[in-house]
Regions:
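Glycine-biased, small-residue-rich flexible motifs in mid-sequence functional cores and linkers
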Residues: 2-6, 82-377
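Short, small/acidic-rich helices and loops at N termini and domain boundaries
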Residues: 1-86, 260, 360-369, 373-376
């Protein structure tokens, strides 16, 4: 069964167990001389290693049939890359704890080809209308060089993937569970979205081997891969305990760019993003901020354009129309306090609507923080 296996094959066996990180596999190799010797060693020879892990490893090894697992992957068109492979995405390879193996469907080469334009877009699973609109406007303002990475969960993740596809951008999804036969471990409602990502030339990737259980502890591991694949991470909306905060933390630990969208101080879904901004994270209120933060020159076709006034209500609803009318009465320039008083709207609604209007190029702010109405309106 183990005849004619290369050192790469034995690396695959160890990585497939999901018991050892890349650093630990390296230590095992150094201790035994080769991974083949480690695999064939008796349990007594493993005394230098943690007993509970050794017990799990020998239980795994007893039931592991390499040819069966490789055939399963091949039959279901599930590909894999090892950390020691040349094609392994370099952005991911350069984080503190890169996964020793990744399983994927689709075109994983995008992760390398578009690494300088790779952007993680993450946020709350229970996204607000504000969060969804902001994600939509921001992604619509990016050109086709960008690769959008997210986690295929509900809320902002779903919005990020859909808007990328709608705007002709490639997108990749990172799962918190395994790839299985015709089943993708994501919300059932996103099954066809996952298929669409692959059909449109994107990819779905995970570090969890087939048949493994989906556990709560999987998701922080997934979040580190989302951040690790990308040059920058944008948090659109996040509550106090949102996993998106952890993704931002992983990105910062990897010396990647971290950005956040300002939100209402009254919104539970903006506690995380507003805290990130307090911690000197770059604020994003329009696509041009993403280009600036990532050091990418904006394509002429994506420079902010003023939207037709007929679309204002569609973009920002009745509140948007009220704010525009207020600014017209105030000679197209006003403080936020003046707008609130004039519109008879509460503060959170004014702030959230202004952000949408800014993203749409309908209003802007000057150095004093005053709101300016577009000259074309």
């Amino acid at each position: 069964m183990l005849k004619n296996n290369s050192e790469r094959d034995f690396y695959f066996f160890f990585a497939y167990s999901d018991l050892f990180g890349a650093e630990k596999i390296s230590l095992i190799k150094n201790f035994f001389g080769t991974l083949e010797k480690a695999w064939l060693a008796e349990k007594i020879e493993w005394q230098e290693f943690k007993n509970s892990t050794v017990e799990k490893f020998f239980k795994f090894k007893k039931n592991f049939l390499p040819e069966r697992e490789k055939n399963y992957l091949q039959e279901n068109k599930i590909n894999y890359l090892l950390l020691i492979d040349e094609d392994y995405p370099s952005n991911l390879k350069n984080i503190s704890y890169p996964p020793p193996i990744i399983f994927y469907l689709g075109n994983i080469k995008l992760a390398e080809e578009q690494k300088e334009y790779s952007l993680a877009v993450v946020g709350s699973r229970i996204a607000s209308a504000y969060g969804r609109q902001v994600a939509k406007e921001l992604i619509a303002g990016l050109d086709k060089r960008f690769l959008i990475i997210s986690g295929l969960a509900f809320g902002i993740d779903t919005c990020a993937h859909r808007e990328a596809l709608a705007n002709g951008l490639k997108t990749g999804a990172v799962l918190g569970g395994p790839l299985e036969k015709d089943i993708i471990s994501c919300p059932a409602e996103n099954y066809w979205l996952a298929k669409k990502i692959i059909a449109d030339g994107g990819f779905i990737v995970t570090e969890f081997p087939p048949h493994s259980l989906i556990q709560k502890s999987n998701f922080p591991r997934r979040n580190r891969i989302i951040a690790g694949l990308c040059l920058g991470t944008l948090v659109v909306e996040a509550g106090r305990k949102s996993g998106a905060n952890k993704t931002a933390e992983y990105a910062r630990d990897a010396n990647r760019v971290v950005m956040a969208v300002p939100g209402s101080i009254y919104s539970e879904l903006s506690i995380g993003t507003n805290k990130l901004l307090k911690d000197h994270t770059d604020a994003v209120s329009g696509p041009e901020d993403i280009y600036r933060c990532l050091g990418i020159k904006m394509a002429n076709s994506k420079k902010p354009k003023i939207k037709n006034t007929e679309n204002i209500e569609k973009i920002a609803g009745e509140d948007g129309l009220k704010i525009i009318k207020s600014l017209l009465l105030l000679n197209k320039i006003a403080n936020i306090e003046e707008i609130i008083e004039n519109c008879q709207l509460d503060t959170p609604r004014v702030h959230s609507t202004l952000t949408i209007l800014e993203l749409s190029g309908i209003v802007s702010r000057n150095g004093s923080g005053q709101i300016l109405l577009s000259k074309n309106l």
